[in-house]
Amino acid sequence: MGRMHAPGKGISQSALPYRRSVPTWLKLTADDVKEQIFKLGKKGLTPSQIGVMLRDSHGVAQVRFVTGKKILRIMKAMGLAPDLPEDLYYLIKKAVAMGKHLERNRKDKDSKFRLILVESRIHRLARYYKTKSVLPPNWKYESSTASALVA
């Protein structure tokens, strides 16, 4: 998929392994992986951070191949899912940081322009999540109250 506010086509991506079976050297069972997800989710880690942690320290390349479910679905079943989707959360966090920067540096025209681009991404993503019923239909992003969402 192409980029929204850049000329790049976004072709590079990581390749999933061809074999979808669990490697023979992996000693963790599906229940062990779910238990690790529960522990890491309790600490407040996001699904992508949990995936990186499981990959790097436990050797689980793809949680979905081991458990049959994605990390976020497992977290939802355990009641640990975040109220905001992860990509939207990080975009809002970026917009809040840019807003703080603009309060200190009023004449930074480029940052002001980039903030507009980030906020338009937030609005587009929010519209998508409203159609998918992930966000309530009356949810609205406002830059004045955004810092409370990511705090």
UniProtKB/Swiss-Prot annotation:
GO terms for biological process: translation. Belongs to the universal ribosomal protein uS15 family. This is Small ribosomal subunit protein uS15. One of its GO terms (molecular function) is structural constituent of ribosome. Keywords: Ribonucleoprotein, Ribosomal protein. CDD domains: Ribosomal_S15p_S13e (cd00353). InterPro entries: Ribosomal_uS15, Ribosomal_uS15_arc_euk, Ribosomal_uS15_N, uS15_NS1_RNA-bd_sf. It comes from Plutella xylostella. The keyword Ribosomal protein applies.
